[in-house]
């Protein structure tokens, strides 16, 4: 039994929190990062269809092929819409390379949201969700059909290095969502090439 919520917040409520400046950022294909100190929202707009986007978000076994710091990824357990994923993460921090193994529980809801939480890893806690929502044409333009977003809460016990952790985590969030959008768009382009 999962401890994750199966509730999907209505898109209207979710998107109503965005300002006109936020929509302008998304319309320019920039990454929108909001929040701080361990509580973040990150969002991008993309022209891909929801099916392609969902396929990328749930391609757990292949995260290492397109996520920047993931060097190994595998499904440990899968049952219905619940999947346990283990990833080996490798990144440069200052003058050294740091590796960590992270195990997450992921709960897929209505092909629109993936709620996740950390089961094992080097953080005190991490939980949140990925979402796919239709992009309002009037706000982001005709070129984007879909909004891909992640809400995440994360905390690490790093003592006096907490601000450095937050900076690294924020950079990682932006790099990850850029890589996910790039993979979605690569797959959509490959699919179009096959069709023509």
Regions flagged by a language model, labelled:
Residues 33, 64, 74-122, 178-187, ...:
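Glycine-rich portal/gate segments that line the openings of hydrophobic small-molecule binding cavities
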Residues 37-45, 82-84, 113, 125, ...:
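Intrinsic-disorder/low-complexity, polar/charged segments enriched in Ser/Thr/Lys/Arg/Asp/Glu/Gln
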Residues 128-129, 172-176, 193-196:
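Soluble, non-transmembrane catalytic domains of enzymes that act on hydrophobic metabolites at membranes
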Residues 50, 75-82, 107-113, 131-147:
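A short, structured loop/turn motif at beta-sheet edges
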Residues 52-59, 168-181:
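Short, well-ordered alpha-helical segments
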Residues 2-82:
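Hydrophobic ligand-binding cavity/cleft-lining segments
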Residues 117-171:
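Beta-strand/loop substructures that line and gate deep hydrophobic ligand-binding cavities in soluble
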Residues 46-50, 89-93, 106-110, 122, ...:
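Beta-strand elements of well-folded, non-transmembrane domains
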């Amino acid at each position: 039994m999962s401890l994750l919520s199966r509730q999907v917040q209505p898109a209207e409520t979710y998107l109503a929190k965005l300002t006109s400046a936020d929509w302008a950022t998304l319309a320019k294909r920039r990454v929108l990062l909001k929040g701080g100190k361990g509580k973040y929202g990150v969002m991008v707009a993309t022209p891909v269809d929801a099916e392609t986007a969902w396929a990328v978000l749930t391609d757990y076994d292949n995260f290492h092929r397109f996520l920047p710091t993931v060097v190994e990824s595998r499904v440990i357990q899968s049952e219905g819409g619940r999947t346990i994923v283990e990833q080996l993460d490798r990144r440069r921090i200052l003058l050294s390379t740091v590796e960590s193994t992270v195990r997450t529980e992921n709960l897929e809801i209505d092909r629109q949201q993936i709620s996740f939480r950390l089961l094992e890893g080097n953080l005190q806690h991490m939980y949140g969700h990925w979402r796919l929502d239709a992009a309002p044409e009037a706000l982001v333009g005709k070129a984007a059909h879909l909004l891909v977003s992640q809400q995440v809460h994360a905390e690490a016990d790093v003592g006096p290095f907490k601000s450095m952790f937050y900076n690294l985590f924020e950079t990682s969030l932006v790099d990850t969502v850029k890589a996910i959008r790039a993979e979605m768009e690569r797959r959509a382009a490959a699919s179009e090439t096959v069709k023509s």
